[in-house]
């Protein structure tokens, strides 16, 4: 049974370990089992401050982790916490990434694209797709914003300023890579301008496409309506949407 299944009451969890991933980015590890599908999210509660949705970026049989970029009051306070401190966890919630029949059991050609802190949404997905030997592309503004770059043996890095990896964006090489690998599906999470370019590319080449969208979420279960986007509740219908849903 998933002990975090409560919709409205967070379970207080002790931070087991904290990893400094890169400049301004930390991962918080919890030694508990989580029944989680890649692309779902958990609501993280900092008592007396706020509650925010965060992707699960580490997952094993007996622990899970979330990765947090410091960029506001909530995350700044989160970054002051130390092992032994507690956070409230609700979830997991939402519709995650799917695995079509044509890529199951190591079949099919797969590409995963992460941009900036969106990389946290696709890490568990990448690990689940290891039998497919996926193409992994990661982009960030500068080298100091790249995290998880040493987590995978085969990963192509991009930076806007050329400080590490290829200067430019992951979308710059999609045409060349698709001509070589013939992708059956491309998964992505990151800045919407990047995901929009991947969407257009997949639509043009008739490639299956799934993207994780970021919206302000308050309840996580489709009640408050804060995350509605064109009639879709991102917390419940998403945060992952396929090409057909986004086309509509």
Describe the residue ranges of each PLM region.
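Ferredoxin-reductase
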Residues: 2-85
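FNR/FR-type flavoprotein reductase catalytic core
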Residues: 73-216
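Iron-sulfur (Fe-S) cluster-binding segments and ferredoxin-like electron-carrier domains
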Residues: 199-200, 204-210, 225-248
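Local cysteine-cluster metal-coordination motifs and their immediate loop/turn environment
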Residues: 119-121, 192-193, 214-239
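Short, Lys/Arg-enriched, disordered terminal segments
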Residues: 1-9, 102-107, 182, 247-248
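Structural signal for conserved beta-strand scaffold positions within catalytic alpha/beta enzyme cores
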Residues: 17, 58, 157-159, 211, ...
